[in-house]
Amino acid sequence: MSKPVVSTPLCSILHELRTAENSGSYFQPKLRSLKAANPKLKLLDVGSGWGHMGCSLAQALGPAGRVVGVDISPESISHAREVAGRCGLEDRVDFVQGDAYKLPFADNEFDVAHAHQVLAHLERPWDVIAEMVRVTKPGGFVAIREGDLESEIVYPAEPGLLKFHKLIATAMTARGKGGGGADTGRKLLPWALKAGAKRDQITVSYGTWWFDTPEHKDKWAKAMTGQVRDGMVGEIAKKTGLATEEDLEEMATAWEEWAAREDSSLAMMHGEILVEK
């Protein structure tokens, strides 16, 4: 990846909410089928970040399975290994540094290759899908899930939140340079086809994220305010003049007020694909 997407403590706030159960239900039936035939499954988690999803996937595979997470950031790899240790999974999960555009693995090495909320950040996501297919064994599958920010609904739709939505969508699209962006979830099928997969190999589905409990709203709001005050969104806004300091503070305050409300909620669609090999 030419410009690494580095997980931060603010990113980790949301990563901790992601599990194989709530973010991987679309591939669980196929995973169970493979596991019944071979308990010693090997799964690759591409863009593994701080390791929370990889550890959850290891628990889903069971004691005989193994997960390898790959990420461009050495800081993320170090933290992911700490997470695996805290979960008691260091013998079943490993994390290695590598480039998603050129995965450091042999052809046909994994039963499953998985990515979650990764392609939205990349300029050539179809090339990453092709790499994931390459390292997957015949009879295995690739599983990818990506958010579609353009489908987001939020209540109440306060002006500061609407400004934020427009800004982050613009920032993501600019960063993707014609690849990933704010509408990534709906593009997984054409990208898989561009990667060389045949249509009858691909299964498409859609899922939903929603945040309505105080705990989950607080985590979401902290991550979004972090993006505005210290993260990618604020950085791009300042460099390009898309928003002033006053605009950014209005957005951050709007998220804090949204999280504190009893009647607030948010939902977003996610695209999901399985590519069978």
Residue ranges and their predicted role:
Residues S2-V6, K163-L167, Q201-L266:
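C-terminal helical/coil "lid" or tail adjacent to the Rossmann-like core of SAM-dependent
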Residues W126-F141:
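A short glycine-rich, Lys/Arg-flanked "PGG" loop and its adjoining helix->strand segment in the class I
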